[in-house]
Structure formats: structure tokens, C-alpha cells
């Protein structure tokens, strides 16, 4: 990675950290939310061997529009059209009911750009590992299992994107008795 890539990624991390600064995970420790997008970016870099800086940027920013006051226009103006487009490809419409958002994720997964599919895969892997580590407050064992089953449906539509990440997801699904 060259110096300008490092500077770009640090600027992206700083932007995401500012946007997510008051958010916490639903785990008992109240982990800072920024750990999630950083973890998703790290999975892409370290496990998926992704070196495309724009994909890593999109991973760092993937929840900013969905969960903060960030707009796609702001992302495009600060980080460029490609990063904004990748983030758009992984962003749910929060105005829709949760069940409809989940249905759309399954339906839209096969039609995303390759770059958006990478972010989706890493996001699912991070979330499933997190659920194995610690059940969110208010979640039953059944809800966790249902999340795994739903995530497997999304991941089915992302097959052929990144063998290393898909293999790790497959292992998690097998451990849970969920067919892919």
C-alpha cells in the first residue's frame, strides 16, 4: 500500500468514526459501533486478500447512510462516485419494515456489483462471528438461529465472489446446522 492509499484510508476511518461516534453495539459491553465497520474492512483485507482501496473504503463507510445522517451525495462528494455506489449497493432502506428489508437483501444479493458483494460477504461474516461471540441484549437463541438462517439465504446469492470468505461463512453455517 502506498502512502496516498494509507492517507485515504485514514481519512475514511476518521470520517466513519466521527459519524458513528455516539453509537454502541447491543452487546453487554456496549462496544463502540466503529469496531464493526473496521472489522468488516479488516476481513476483506486480511482474510479476503482484497487490495482495492475503494472496496475497503466502502466497507468502512457501509453503515453510514443507513445508521447516521450521512447521505449518498456526501459520500460521493468526499470519497467519489465508486465508493458511494458500493455503499449504496449494501444500504437498506430504513423506511421499510424490517421483514421487507430482509426480503430485499435476499432478493437483491445476486444482482449487486462484485464490489458490493465483497462488502456484503464480509459484513455477514463479521455479524455471524459477533453473534457466536455474544448474543445481543434482548435476543433469544431462536432469534440468533433465525439470523443465521436468513444470512445463509443472502450468502447464497453472493456465491462465487470470494472463496476464502465464503469458506469461512460455510464453516459457521455448518456449525449451526444451517444449509447453504
Swiss-Prot record:
Keyword Hydrolase among record annotations: yes
The record's listing under PROSITE patterns reads: HD
Q: Which GO molecular-function terms appear in the entry?
A: guanosine-3',5'-bis(diphosphate) 3'-diphosphatase activity; metal ion binding
Record's keyword terms, sorted: Hydrolase, Manganese, Metal-binding
Q: Which residues bind Mn(2+)?
A: 36, 62-63, 123
**Which cofactors does this gene product need?**
Mn(2+)
Entries under Pfam families matching the protein: HD_4 (PF13328)
Where's the active site on this chain? 66 (nucleophile), 67 (nucleophile)
Question: What EC numbers are recorded for this enzyme?
Answer: 3.1.7.2
Give start and end of each HD domain. Answer: 33-128
Recorded superkingdom: Eukaryota
Main EC class the enzyme belongs to = hydrolase
Q: Which reaction does it catalyse?
A: guanosine 3',5'-bis(diphosphate) + H2O = GDP + diphosphate + H(+)
Function noted in UniProt: ppGpp hydrolyzing enzyme involved in starvation response.
Sequence similarity: Belongs to the MESH1 family.
The protein's name is Guanosine-3',5'-bis(diphosphate) 3'-pyrophosphohydrolase MESH1
Source organism per entry reads Danio rerio (Zebrafish)
Source lineage: Eukaryota, Metazoa, Chordata, Craniata, Vertebrata
Amino acid at each position: 500500500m502506498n502512502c496516498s492509499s494509507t492517507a485515504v484510508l485514514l481519512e475514511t476511518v476518521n470520517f466513519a468514526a466521527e459519524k458513528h461516534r455516539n453509537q454502541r453495539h447491543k452487546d453487554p459491553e456496549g462496544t463502540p459501533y466503529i469496531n464493526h465497520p473496521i472489522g468488516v474492512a479488516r476481513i476483506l483485507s486480511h482474510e479476503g486478500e482484497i487490495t482495492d482501496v475503494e472496496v475497503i473504503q466502502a466497507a468502512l463507510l457501509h453503515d453510514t447512510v443507513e445508521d447516521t445522517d450521512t447521505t449518498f451525495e456526501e459520500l460521493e462528494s468526499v470519497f467519489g462516485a465508486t465508493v458511494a455506489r458500493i455503499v449504496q449497493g449494501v444500504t437498506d432502506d430504513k423506511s421499510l419494515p424490517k421483514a421487507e428489508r430482509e426480503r430485499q437483501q435476499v432478493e437483491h444479493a445476486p444482482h449487486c456489483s462484485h464490489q458490493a458483494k465483497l462488502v456484503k460477504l464480509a459484513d455477514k461474516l463479521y455479524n455471524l462471528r459477533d453473534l457466536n461471540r455474544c448474543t445481543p441484549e434482548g435476543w433469544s437463541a431462536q432469534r440468533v438461529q433465525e439470523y443465521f438462517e436468513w444470512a445463509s439465504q443472502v450468502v447464497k446469492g453472493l456465491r462465487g465472489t470470494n472463496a476464502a470468505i465464503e469458506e469461512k461463512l460455510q464453516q459457521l453455517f455448518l456449525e449451526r446446522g444451517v444449509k447453504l
